[in-house]
Amino acid sequence: MYKRQGQYFLTTHPDYNVAVVSPYYLPEATVTALQEQLAAYGEDCNGDGKVVVKINQYTMAFNSEDSDAYLDMAGTTKLSTDIQSSLSSIFILYDPAGFQQTTGTLRYLDGHLPKSDADSDWWNMVYRWTDCPVLTGMELGSYTSDAVQSASGDSQQLLADYYIGIRGAWLKESASLLENSEPLWANLTAGAVSTAGEGH
């Protein structure tokens, strides 16, 4: 807590950081609902009496000629900082193949770390959003047009095209930072059977 001009501001430190990487920002209503719903499956890791999940959004379209180069560059820079500092451990991805090929960040679903030439094996590192009963069962409501989204619709339908994965820890420093996220990952993927490899 710090004081500023006679007012007190309570700074909230999230227990978990979850990254969303996609060509466009998710609607604000979807992000807010997602943060609240994800928190129900986490623990109070920092002991402040509440469970807080922060969604970090990074916009980039891998291997797309139609994408906004400036947005992509800004998103790439922010994502690189996130990965290097082990900020986010769980990733919600629109294009897991492009993400893994670019970052080499994800681990296998069975917990093993992939070798450096295993990026094309990405489908063994993610679940489809729709593979996970816990995720599809979340009450995420609907979104209306806002600053980032011109359309309106159902948040679950929007996320049905996404995948979810967890990053690997190759260094001791990142391993300790990621340790808190293991129970959350286990809770979110409970009962999931991956269909990401179908068609490969």
Model-derived features with residue positions:
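A structural signal for short loop-to-beta-strand junctions that line the ligand-binding cleft
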Residues: L106-A175
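Acidic, glycine-anchored loop motifs typical of Ca2+
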Residues: C45-F62, D68-A69
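Solvent-exposed loop/turn segments at secondary-structure junctions
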Residues: Y24-P27, P96-Q100, W170-L171
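Short, well-ordered beta-strand elements
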Residues: D15-Y25
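Short, small-residue-biased leader/transition segments that mark boundaries at the very start
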Residues: M1-Y2
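Short, polar/charged alpha-helical segment
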Residues: E28-V52
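Surface-exposed amphipathic alpha-helical segments
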Residues: S176-E198
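Extracytoplasmic "Venus flytrap"/periplasmic binding protein-like
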Residues: M73-P133
